[in-house]
């Protein structure tokens, strides 16, 4: 490979790394979650994170080649199945090369309640500074990061469920009936 070609690739990369050298890393608990726009890879519906304010969002970064990630997705699917999408949305952002086809993932996610978010060029993963997989952010109703989980194991499920329950808060009061029963004396 010609030396000029190597340097033409390494110099910009080195500059980008140096620019981020002093950064604290990704967003932290309490920070406003970095916004993104994308689409659901299965339904092709637009997704705009900031439009989810008022809902709890589980945002997980994963890869099909990552064994813990493959174990985490069914757990998140069961979680989404138990809570209405009016209250909670679960987004799975695949971490893969831009040229990898989404077709096999779409086939898997068609049968799941979890939303497969397209991130072909890694821009969403870049905003969150993903450095390990799976990497999950729990975003509260106010748009702030309520919890962060790196890695996955069976022992992490209770903590994740507790964090989601805390973010959801107490169950909302039931809507008043159209014809309330008469008061008893």
Question: Language-model segments: which ranges?
Answer:
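A short beta-strand-turn-helix
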Residues: 36-57
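Thiol/disulfide oxidoreductase modules built on the thioredoxin-like
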Residues: 106-112, 119-165
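Hydrophobic beta-strand core positions in alpha/beta domains
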Residues: 60, 92, 137-138
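Bacterial N-terminal signal peptides
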Residues: 7-16
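N-proximal helix/coil linker or "cap" segments that precede and/or mark the start of modular domains
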Residues: 15-35, 170-185
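Structural microenvironment flanking redox-active thiols in thiol-disulfide oxidoreductases
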Residues: 70-109, 120-126, 162
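Short pre-active-site segment immediately N-terminal to redox-active cysteine/selenocysteine motifs
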Residues: 55-57, 61-65, 132
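Positively charged n-region of N-terminal signal peptides that target proteins for export
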Residues: 1-4
């Amino acid at each position: 490979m010609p030396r000029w070609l190597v340097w033409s690739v390494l110099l910009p990369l080195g500059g980008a790394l140096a620019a981020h050298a002093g950064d604290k890393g990704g967003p932290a608990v309490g920070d406003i979650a970095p916004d993104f726009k994308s689409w659901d890879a299965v339904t092709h519906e637009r997704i705009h994170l900031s439009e989810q304010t008022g809902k709890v969002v589980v945002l997980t970064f994963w890869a099909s080649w990552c064994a813990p990630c493959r174990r985490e997705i069914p757990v998140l699917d069961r979680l989404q199945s138990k809570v209405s999408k009016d209250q909670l949305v679960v987004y799975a952002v695949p971490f893969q090369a831009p040229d990898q086809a989404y077709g096999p993932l779409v086939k898997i996610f068609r049968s799941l309640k979890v939303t497969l978010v397209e991130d072909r060029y890694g821009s969403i993963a870049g905003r969150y500074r993903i450095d390990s997989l799976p990497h999950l952010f729990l975003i509260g109703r106010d748009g702030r990061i309520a919890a962060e989980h790196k890695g996955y194991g069976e022992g992490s499920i209770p903590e994740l469920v507790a964090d989601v329950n805390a973010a959801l808060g107490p169950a909302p009061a039931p809507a008043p009936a159209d014809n309330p029963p008469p008061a008893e004396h």
